[in-house]
Amino acid sequence: MRNIFDQYSQQENRLTHALMCALTEDKKLLQYFIRWITGKAAPKNIEIIEQGLPGEPELDEDESEKRGLPDAWIFNDNNWSLLIESKISAPLKNDQLHRHYSTALRRGFDDITLLAIDAVKPKSNLPAYVIFRRWSEIYTWLCVQSNYSHWALKTARFIEVAESKWSAEGYLKEGALTVFSGIPFSDDNPYNYPEAKRLLKLALDELGARKDLVRELGMDPQSLGRGAITGRDGVAVWDFLRLKKSNNEEPFTKYPHLTLALESDKILTIITVPHGIKTTFRKNIVNLGFEGFYELMAQVNNNLDKALNKATGAAPWVVVVQRRYPFQRASAIVDARIEYDLRTAFSSRKKQPVKVQQEWLKATYEALSKKRSNLQVAVGAIFPYRTCEVTRHPDMINFIANTWIACKPLLDVMLKA
């Protein structure tokens, strides 16, 4: 069934229409919106039109585009107006904004504000009468208002779906329409791949800008990760952040990296020791001997215990996988896989439900030290959607970052000169 907001052919017009529908239907939401944008209380007797001019019949979309009219016009009969011009793929242009402002002046409005909306911040300075907001800021505001406004919630959800769809279609090339607010998958809201791709991009965009990851781990904020993820279906989607030390060297599997995966049942946050890692890095671990490796992982486990303290349901995690590829670009065939809770290797003074079985950690060390296959080892944490409520909270981004930072001792050993 077609969404009630999907009434226009141009994508930015659909978003503006969704926002205007919400403001028209919820008068209190409209008042809050005007105060948020202008900093002043909303005047009385407000009207809203789209793709038209006050006092004239509403035009169709094509005719409106030909005449270069504002996307929306909020006004009253006392010469007050708020004009809206929105973009997604095309840049904002000052001459277009000036024409809108001049049109309002010619029609007798003298208290004029022009709101310009885009996915990214404009590269040139905007006129003084223009207030700029990113679509992601509009989305964040709607999410806050959704605590009491059903229309704000509907509009925020529409923006989420639009971002997922337009990103997959290649229409949304820069910026984002939303911001990371958690991973909402649950029994009531099952995992779906396009949404997971959208959420993964939002999370990594935010994580890639974190100074603590640069400071503690040497993360490269300019790293490219996988680039475009072209898949359309699957039970997991993943991407990674590089370390500065890698110098963007290819293939990326020569260096450890920070991996985030959204799987059908959980979030997987890991430091990956890839199959093609430089021999020096692997030997730095192997040369510790099992006792040294045990002490190293005990330190990581202690760090993870602190990092996950308030993430009920999360667990420190190790994944060991042996794969092979029958031909280039083929899907991997998994020949062996071990996954285990890192707490199985260590006794604890605290009462814990996990029983000690140190042999899993020994098997990991043995596989690394006698590597003869396409072998990957990863250390970090899992956050199951069913048992870990923090996955659905914006603070999840901090747990992801802190999980990586908790694994710093492993990185330090691998990367030492």
Predicted regions, residues:
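Charged, terminal alpha-helix-loop-beta segments
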Residues: M1-A417
